Amino acid sequence: MMPLLLLILLSTRNLLGAAQSQESPVAGERRALDLTTVYVLPRSEPINATVEHKCREALASCYNGSEFQPLHDDGPIRPDPYRFSTMIRFKRSYGELPLPIELNDEFLEQLSLLHNNTDQLRVLLTLMRTSRASDWMSFLGGYTQCDAPKSVVFTCVESVCYEHDLMRLNYTTDLFTENVLGLDVSPPVLSVLVLLRNNHTKAESVVRVPTSSMSLLDGTYNLLRTILGHMSLDTDLIGVLRSYRDRFPAVFSVSDQIKITRQHYRPQYQRKRP
């Protein structure tokens, strides 16, 4: 429903901090949110056509304090259950030998998440991006003995099994195709909290999926800054979040043109021949 760029639904009147309006907000006054235009930060081109109207109506109902009817009884909106976020994209490993799997309570809990789970493939992809990724990669390495490529796995519910090529799945940049609960901002690590659930075994667990993309943190900062400014709320939280940005390792730097460049990269100049 919402792209990774974090869509902000704002009224055209208050989009740029009342830069186009001469009226100043009255203290304590709560204005209704007029969802006439949809914008993506930091740009300001309207993109109404890309946002489902039900999303705008739900946000307006929530913001204005009216009765809210969820779009679905449970879980996030998934127009296509076979779309997966690039956050959990399968990454092929080369030259790694299978290692013994540590059978502890954590691993057994993860097995209960997979057993007869109709969303088994999504859960498996997510687990392969957690701290127990090496265990699952070792487990999948055994498929090569059956003359199947490493990227091919089989998911089974009861006696029905399906074959999947993890390199050819329908991946999308939409982060919220997963059960995202929030962000874990703990410099030098930035993780996404994802809820995994098995309706068959009634098992559920929240896992951390590490990410090295600072665009997620920057998008969250832009989101909170705009909403708090629109509602005339205290901006101390914005200052704290901004300070977090400087506490992450200087792997990436953002230039004035909002381009991501490696900090250790230096242009090489050719010597002039005499």
Swiss-Prot record:
Gene name, Swiss-Prot/TrEMBL: gL
Topological relation to the membrane, as annotated: Peripheral membrane protein
Function: The heterodimer glycoprotein H-glycoprotein L is required for the fusion of viral and plasma membranes leading to virus entry into the host cell. Acts as a functional inhibitor of gH and maintains gH in an inhibited form. Upon binding to host integrins, gL dissociates from gH leading to activation of the viral fusion glycoproteins gB and gH.
Database matches in HAMAP family: HSV_GL_betahv
Protein name in UniProt: Envelope glycoprotein L
Residues spanning the signal sequence: 1-21
Family: Belongs to the herpesviridae glycoprotein L (gL) family. Betaherpesvirinae gL subfamily.
GO cellular component: host cell Golgi apparatus; host cell plasma membrane; membrane; viral envelope; virion membrane
Domain of life: Viruses
Assembly and binders: Interacts with glycoprotein H (gH); this interaction is necessary for the correct processing and cell surface expression of gH.
Annotated source species: Murid herpesvirus 1 (strain Smith) (MuHV-1)
Disulfide bonds: C156-C161
Family annotation (InterPro entries): Cytomegalo_gL
Record carries keyword Disulfide bond: yes
Any one GO biological process: fusion of virus membrane with host plasma membrane
Main location: virion
Keywords tagged on the record: Disulfide bond, Fusion of virus membrane with host cell membrane, Fusion of virus membrane with host membrane, Glycoprotein, Host cell membrane, Host Golgi apparatus, Host membrane, Membrane, Signal, Viral envelope protein, Viral penetration into host cytoplasm, Virion, Virus entry into host cell
Places the protein is found: Virion membrane; Host cell membrane; Host Golgi apparatus, Host trans-Golgi network
